[in-house]
Every structure is written in structure tokens, then in C-alpha cells.
Amino acid sequence: MSSGGLLLLLGLLTLWEVLTPVSSKDRPKFCELPADIGPCEDFTGAFHYSPREHECIEFIYGGCEGNANNFNTLEECESACAA
């Protein structure tokens, strides 16, 4: 195979890796936890991954405790949990 063909193959494999969704078996276990508002009342917007919806969803967070399925931004949630 020529070097141009190898570069094309490498580029296609890289693109496939980037675009391939995270499978549920590769997703961290904390992504399966339910949204948890926590006991505090410093209400703010946060994001959690919803296994049922297969996407990150905004919810109201109380500001303390809760669980690990809690992200400040949609991007953080998608990076950790979403496909």
C-alpha cells in the first residue's frame, strides 16, 4: 500500500474513532445514577446523563452533596457520559 493510501486509512480510522458513540459498557457507572438535587437550597442549573433518554439533561441542583452524575456544563456531561 502506498504512503498516501496509509495516510488515508489512518485518517478514516481516526475519524471513525472520534465519531463512534460511547457504548453503555464503556460508560462510567456514575452516569447511570439518577439526578440528585441534594439537600441544600442554593438552586442552580446543572446537567446529568439520563440513561433512559440517552443524553445529558439540565436539572435544578441544590448546590451540595447529590451524586457524581452532576455536571456544571452540558459539555462536561457529554464528555463524561454521552455518545
UniProtKB/Swiss-Prot annotation:
Tissue expression per record: Expressed by the venom gland.
Keywords: Disulfide bond, Protease inhibitor, Secreted, Serine protease inhibitor, Signal
Domain BPTI/Kunitz inhibitor: 31-81
GO molecular function: serine-type endopeptidase inhibitor activity
Subcellular location: Secreted
Pfam families registered for this protein in UniProt: Kunitz_BPTI
Highest rank taxon of the organism: Eukaryota
Cysteines joined through disulfide linkages: 31-81, 40-64, 56-77
Keyword DNA damage found: no
GO CC terms, sorted: extracellular region
Signal peptide: 1-24
Family in the record: Belongs to the venom Kunitz-type family.
Function text: Serine protease inhibitor.
Protein name, UniProt field: Kunitz-type serine protease inhibitor microlepidin-3
UniProt source species: Oxyuranus microlepidotus (Inland taipan)
Lineage: Eukaryota, Metazoa, Chordata, Craniata, Vertebrata
